[in-house]
């Protein structure tokens, strides 16, 4: 099993698809990496040679992926919360950030319903 950027990529998949298992690499970026490394996108991971894997490792080093990317995204959210902007406050309150309605929808973001006692007559 090939290990790139700390991730074991699946052996039986085409390398073009297998690279997308790495956080921060989608299909477009996978094609870019394969072109840069000079590796055939139709080859299976199990058929890769050691020098091909090393070329792929070198090609992925120029991109922000995995832990570094997760850290960057976390810092961006923390920055929004620290400066107190609307987006940061919405993130902190676990509400939709991009202007969606919350009176009836947004169940995923708000969580399960909280039962409120009814009004006595």
UniProtKB/Swiss-Prot annotation:
Keyword line: Ribonucleoprotein, Ribosomal protein, RNA-binding, rRNA-binding, tRNA-binding
Segments of this protein annotated with the region Disordered: 97-121
An example Gene Ontology molecular-function term: structural constituent of ribosome
Example GO BP: translation
Disulfide bridge positions per record: none
Pfam family, one: Ribosomal_S13
SUPFAM superfamilies membership: S13-like H2TH domain
Residue ranges, compositional bias (Basic residues): 100-121
UniProt superkingdom: Bacteria
Matches recorded under InterPro entries: Rbsml_uS13_C, Ribosomal_uS13, Ribosomal_uS13-like_H2TH, Ribosomal_uS13_bac-type, Ribosomal_uS13_CS
NCBIfam families: uS13_bact
Subunit text: Part of the 30S ribosomal subunit. Forms a loose heterodimer with protein S19. Forms two bridges to the 50S subunit in the 70S ribosome.
HAMAP family associated with the record: Ribosomal_uS13 (MF_01315)
Name by which UniProt lists this protein: Small ribosomal subunit protein uS13
Lineage: Bacteria, Bacillati, Cyanobacteriota, Cyanophyceae, Synechococcales
């Amino acid at each position: 099993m090939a290990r790139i950027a700390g991730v074991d990529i699946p052996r039986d998949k085409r390398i073009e698809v297998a690279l997308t298992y790495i956080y921060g690499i989608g299909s477009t970026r996978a094609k870019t990496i394969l072109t840069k490394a000079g590796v055939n996108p139709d080859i299976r991971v199990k058929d890769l040679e050691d020098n091909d894997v090393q070329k792929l490792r070198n090609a992925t080093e120029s991109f922000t992926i995995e832990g570094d990317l997760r850290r960057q995204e976390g810092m961006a959210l923390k920055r929004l919360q620290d400066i107190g902007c609307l987006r940061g406050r919405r993130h902190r309150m676990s509400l939709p950030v991009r202007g969606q309605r919350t009176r009836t929808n947004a169940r995923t973001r708000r969580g399960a319903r909280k039962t409120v006692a009814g009004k006595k007559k």
